[in-house]
Amino acid sequence: MAHSATAADLKPWRDPAAEPFIKIRNITKKFGDFTAVDNVSLDIFKGELFCLLGGSGCGKSTLLRMMSGFEKPSSGTIEIDGQDMSNVSPYHRPTNMMFQSYALFPHMSVEKNIAYGLLREGMSKPEAMEKVAAMLRLVKLEKFARRKPHQLSGGQRQRVALARSLVKKPKLLLLDEPLGALDKKLREETQFELINIQETLGVTFIVVTHDQEEAMTLSTRIGVMNEGEIVQIGEPTQIYERPASRFVADFIGSTNLIDMETDSTGRAVALG
């Protein structure tokens, strides 16, 4: 079977002529006197699995919520697939959002959870269930269609939430700490499932995480955030091998820092 080209294969961000799928320009979000996101500009390309990486309170989830429409920017613009989102409500954007809590309906079966959004929008039940069946195959949960969420493992619930987020075929899926509720072993297994699903569908994913290893494994590119700003954007190997600042080097970890100064000839000399 032919492999469909993804952003990971083509790396359009290396091409100055490539047109971004998402254009974020000078986005700022203030809550009173506190600036949560500070003048962020960012391009993301179609088919990417882009990670926003940073510690607690750095602004990454606020930036994600502004893309979804659940937070309104104080200033700046967000454009998705050529459309300015300034006056577009969350429910009319070509996006869907998956939360860390998964927010599954406990009284509904797996298949009814996935079908809920389709039926609510007026799709016929036979057509909706056909789409649900395709999603269940994709996330390998066909045998669990009639089970309730409490009868599933954490990893299975995560896949139900993912299927529900994708069944309406959004152009952009926003994932806020999607693996945060899983234990380490299950989180590592689920990372690769997430990559496979994203590449199969070709949907653009933006993932928020505080986990450096998760970002390095999942992403086509990473935007490292600190105090409301994006301090470095790059492919995982670039971020790891060439951190742009001491903060990035410390945050990514596994890096030896050597204090240097230049001598009179301009050569770098180690201190100490």
Region locations from a protein language model:
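The feature captures the beta-strand-to-loop junction immediately N-terminal to the Walker
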Residues: L53-G55
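ABC ATPase nucleotide-binding domain helices that frame the ATP-binding cleft
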Residues: S61-L64, V160
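Helix-to-loop junction immediately C-terminal to a conserved catalytic motif
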Residues: S68
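Conserved ABC transporter NBD signature motif
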Residues: G76-D84
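ABC ATPase nucleotide-binding domains
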Residues: V88-F247
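ATPase nucleotide-binding modules
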Residues: A244-G272
